[in-house]
């Protein structure tokens, strides 16, 4: 079973920590991607051994085509993911149920701050998509 999943964005303009709100915490090291269109790639969210989150995202994007485990996401997909993650934040016992059932190796005491950061990053991304041309993708290492 695979290990890693996440959300990457491609922007036309380079991001810097100074250009982001204080509550946003994304990976600022640019990813080197093999695409010919130029642009800058950044990782907005990353999950390791969180099969529960992977399953939620795959349910959201179930009808989409994929290219070797890469799925394009739109604003509605991001909104649905935020709603699902918020359920874990408001009810950590749901995360612990997933932990007990082998859907993740992390209990809620480890993941709660991570999920809150993900929510902030996704809220920023949803807003950023309103005013910027950005390509968003979910990668699935399975």
Language-model features: where?
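Acidic (Asp/Glu-rich) sequence patches and key acidic residues
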Residues: 1-135, 139-142
